[in-house]
Design a protein with these regions (language model features):
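A nucleotide-sugar donor-handling region in carbohydrate enzymes
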Residues: 149-212, 241-243
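Active-site and donor-binding regions of nucleotide-sugar-utilizing enzymes
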Residues: 12, 17, 70-166, 171-174
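Conserved N-terminal ligand/cofactor-binding loop architecture of enzyme catalytic domains
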Residues: 20-95
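Short helix-capping segments at alpha-helix termini
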Residues: 25-30, 122-127, 166-167, 226-231, ...
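Donor-nucleotide binding loops and adjacent catalytic segments primarily
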Residues: 189-190, 199-260
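Extreme N-terminal starter segment of soluble prokaryotic enzymes
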Residues: 1-4
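Short hydrophobic segments within beta-strands
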Residues: 6-8, 35, 133, 208, ...
Length: 260
């Protein structure tokens, strides 16, 4: 079987899930390809969409929150959202790509390609099965206006929420968020700490901020470090946010109990 896995360059979680799916499909001797949907648009579409999203979330999170709330409002209207029509513009290009490469199924780990696939189904340009994988622990706005064959959700407790938004319950599969098979391999705490040059027995606080290093990580780090005692360690993960990483390393480079 040959599977096309669609993602979008808006943060790392969607791409990580797509890569995990590809790795698992390859393990079972299926052919799989990961494609950024926006790469089918104009030359700089992917960079513009991804860059705008990352900037908004990391630099102006209040603006992102406002847009999210607007999405919650728009989803109540009986017609399709502007998000749907924006992604529908890539429908013909995606349909041609699928036909030219003879895929047997298509999976998306992002809402945007699900919107595109929905348009394609409506226009009769999609004849292979399509599956959407939700990578958020909530039914975010606009999933309800998509029409995929199945929806993989992170947990069975989310089925009522997705169903209440209009997605047929028989299409909801509570299989979880895809992760790489490597995470299933057991590893001892002692070996991992030695590998990361961390004290083997000291209490450790781990602070994660997503692939983009967003949020008030610097404030949390300062507050946490001020409360460390008796050799407690703090590990701060900044994702791809190199600016934040450099800033925190500069501030805490003299503290042996803080690892950025």
């Amino acid at each position: 079987m040959k599977v096309l896995i669609l993602s979008c360059n808006t943060g790392g979680g969607h791409n990580a899930a797509a890569s995990a799916l590809k790795e698992s499909l390859n393990f079972y001797h299926h052919e799989a390809e990961v494609l950024d949907l926006m790469s089918l648009g104009r030359k700089h579409t992917s960079a513009l969409v991804g860059g705008a999203y990352v900037k908004l979330v990391s630099v102006f999170p209040a603006g992102f929150g406002a847009l999210y709330q607007l999405g919650e409002l728009v989803r109540k209207f009986p017609w399709k959202s502007p998000v749907y029509y924006a992604n529908a513009r890539l429908g013909n290009a995606l349909a041609d790509y699928i036909d030219q490469n003879h895929f047997n199924a298509v999976v998306t780990t992002h809402l945007y390609p699900a919107e595109t696939l929905t348009w394609m189904k409506q226009k009769g340009r999609l004849t292979i099965p399509c599956v959407a994988v939700a990578t958020d622990y909530a039914c975010i706005p606009f999933w309800e206006e998509t029409n995929c064959d199945y929806y993989v959700v992170p947990h069975k407790d989310l089925i009522p929420e997705f169903a209440s938004c209009g997605i047929p319950e028989e299409k909801l599969l509570p299989l979880g968020i895809p992760v790489r098979p490597a995470f299933a391999r057991p590893a001892s705490k002692e070996d991992v700490r030695r590998h990361l040059d961390l004290p083997e027995n000291a209490p450790l606080f781990l602070v994660m901020s997503g692939s983009m290093g967003f949020g008030k990580v610097h404030l949390l780090t300062h507050e946490l470090v001020s409360r460390l005692e008796n050799g407690e360690q703090a590990v701060i993960i900044c994702g791809n946010n190199k600016k934040r990483m450099r800033s925190l390393r500069l501030q805490f480079h003299k503290n042996p109990n803080v690892h950025i």
